[in-house]
Amino acid sequence: MENLTEIESTMESLTEMESERVEQGTDKEIGSGEKRQDDVKETENENSGERVGEEAPVREHEDSPCLIVIEEGTSLASLEEVTNADDLPKIDDEKNSQFETSPHPSPSPSVALDTEEGLINPTAEDTVEENIVSSEVSSDILKDDGDAVEVDRDTAEVQEETANIPESKLSEDTGSPHHHADILMVQEKAAEEHDMIASGDHEEFPVNPDNKHSEENQSPHHHANNVMEQDQAAEEREIISPGEHKEIPANPDTKVVEENNDRIDEGEANNLNLAGDGSGAVDHDYLTKTELDKVLEVPGSETISKLEDRPSEHLSETSMNVEKELEMPAVEILPDNDKNSDVLAVGVSGDSDNVVSVLPASQTSSDRDEGMITVDAEPTEDMKLDVPDSKLVTDTTVDSTNNKDAHVEANTERQDNSSALVLNDANNESAPVKRVPGPYVASSNIKSEARGSGDLNNGVHKIVRTPPVFDGTMRAKRSFLLDDASDGNESGTEEDQSAFMKELDSFFRERNMDFKPPKFYGEGLNCLKLWRAVTRLGGYDKVTGSKLWRQVGESFRPPKTCTTVSWTFRGFYEKALLEYERHKVSEGELQIPLPLELEPMNIDNQASGSGRARRDAASRAMQGWHSQRLNGNGEVSDPAIKDKNLVLHQKREKQIGTTPGLLKRKRAAEHGAKNAIHVSKSMLDVTVVDVGPPADWVKINVQRTQDCFEVYALVPGLVREEVRVQSDPAGRLVISGEPENPMNPWGATPFKKVVSLPTRIDPHHTSAVVTLNGQLFVRVPLEQLE
């Protein structure tokens, strides 16, 4: 009660001082009062649409031409006396000085008394709720009274002027229990909202941009309000973003009416404007930036994820005038208080997509008019990304063509379309930041610092994608093999020749083999040219079978005194390049067509004498029998050589004359020809079947005479000990071969062929002969009938 008594005495003294000032300034404010009254009504209409989640504004009294409020300390009985009075225009100026303006909420905090006197110091949200409750109480009292209060224009102007005191408190009947309950509810709600502000989850209420303040030097109450406003504004700035924001200047629409500058100087007025407590209009973009910056500055891992948890109506409060919002700069660059601190610049565009760009603290953006941020960064080889504590899965895409742009997309389990990390190269200054809605980042340890050396921050994880390096094998593919089709350029450059020799040296060293570069007439041989010449002709086997070594040797322009060109260059290739060729073919790096004829594939240097003799014998055996030739239809025709000899003998007989010896030869030849023609008719009954893997390289031909079957077979590379012949009386002849060395140079493999003869045979008198040339002759006599 003592506090209430002191309050009433203070209010009476203030009322007297205000009434004196009002009487002096009434004539001056008549013209401006009308304009301000219209501004108050327009502000009420605008603010009623901006409030989200608040109670509906209290409607005006039907019979009242202006807004009616009551003074603090005025009871219901006194109000009835004033209402029932006949002389309404003569309302006391002392009471008019305490009238409030409109029932719409004012965002400025109401600080009428100090907290030391026992009352709670409410915040900006407290004032909003308190104004709404007070307006409802005032409206209920006026409705119960039922009488309209009419005030003439002069008195209305005085009320309008005195209502502009920013920190005046809505007066209610202090003795009413209803009022006391309202005060308790307001205090509890203020405490809850104060906790919400401290936790960073409160809503920002837009400030009326048309508020006008009338300041006076004679009101100690007003001076106290200014001091409390500054203290409370400082506390709000510390809650929202401690030490990170610029002082936002007041909007040009704010007007401060100062009549006397004796007690309140210009500095206090500037502090009132800079306090940001409702004394001036604040830009909607600033509110949006303030909300997002508060979320971004929460310490720990909640730095960016707070954006996702905020409801959508927060942004809707600040988007009343979208066109005006789009005209403002979309990005605010905050000052860097510390060169080592990281600044996250947030841009809010018209499509409500948030783009979070990582901007080093030492850099600022000059593209405010374009609504974009150009981030300077080093090339991607030096780019480092520090993500130590998150569930972040980073997918880095590096453009290999220019190796400049790197887009880092961060993927987490929580998906959201609000933000994406974008890094642009410093060389592409004119390129805008890509605004791609991407996955949400749940970590706060994503930093990008600018250093004097040009590197980004010294993070742990370094994302670098280096181009593939060609090793020796790939280089051999490119320069040693792929250029072999170009005629006239088989020699290659000196660098290619040196690289190829190094390749050969490493190849032999890996296999513990000696490699001596060949020399031709005292000079080093161009092995690269020899390699390309042979591989272009089809490889070693093809060149050997086609007898193209002389052609290969002639490309080196040997002297005319060299009479062994073919043998010399063939030896060079066998010693230096043959093993290398076999390796390339086995690895699939060199494609050489298989030879059409079965030719020797390799030569052992250790057994050059016997091996070459055996190889030559096999080659001659493959050329076919001189006595017989098998046609494509399976018939056996007369051998060309015998026919040729027969013709020669006949010519000689005509020239020389008939002699007994020539007649014998002639008869024998004629008999053989007739016998061969006779046997050819029965060859259709002979079948040859492979048992096991097919061996097409083994050729078998069968002829029938009067008393036996003659079987001619080609088994190149096999000797007598490696060939086996079996027969049975039913007419089956089995020819099998088993080479001693499976890795023989002729490619001979184990085989087994069954020849089915049309008649029964005598297996006890069957004989076989194998020559050194790989020819097999088997004589199978017919079964003798007794």
UniProtKB/Swiss-Prot annotation:
Q: Which GO terms describe its molecular function?
A: DNA binding; DNA-binding transcription factor activity
Question: Which ranges does the record mark as transmembrane?
Answer: none
Alphabetical UniProt keywords: DNA-binding, Nucleus, Transcription, Transcription regulation
Q: Where in the cell is it found?
A: Nucleus
Compositional bias per record (Basic and acidic residues), positions renumbered to this chain: 18-64, 87-97, 141-156, 169-182, 199-219, 234-248, 402-416
**Principal location listed in the UniProt entry:** nucleus
Q: Which residues form the sHSP domain?
A: 686-786
GO BP annotations listed: regulation of DNA-templated transcription; regulation of transcription by RNA polymerase II
Record's family? Belongs to the small heat shock protein (HSP20) family.
> What SMART domains does UniProt report for this protein, alphabetically?
ARID, BRIGHT
Query: Under which name does UniProt file this protein?
Result: AT-rich interactive domain-containing protein 3
Q: Which Pfam families match?
A: ARID, HSP20
Gene Ontology cellular-component terms listed? nucleus; protein-containing complex
All copies of the ARID domain together span 494-585
Q: Does the keyword Lipid metabolism apply?
A: no
Taxonomic lineage of the native organism: Eukaryota, Viridiplantae, Streptophyta, Embryophyta, Tracheophyta
Q: Which CDD domains match?
A: ACD_sHsps_p23-like, ARID
Q: Which InterPro entries match?
A: A-crystallin/Hsp20_dom, ARI3A/B/C, ARID_dom, ARID_dom_sf, HSP20-like_chaperone
**Low complexity bias locations:** 1-16, 130-139
Q: Where is this region: Disordered?
A: 1-182, 199-251, 395-420, 606-638
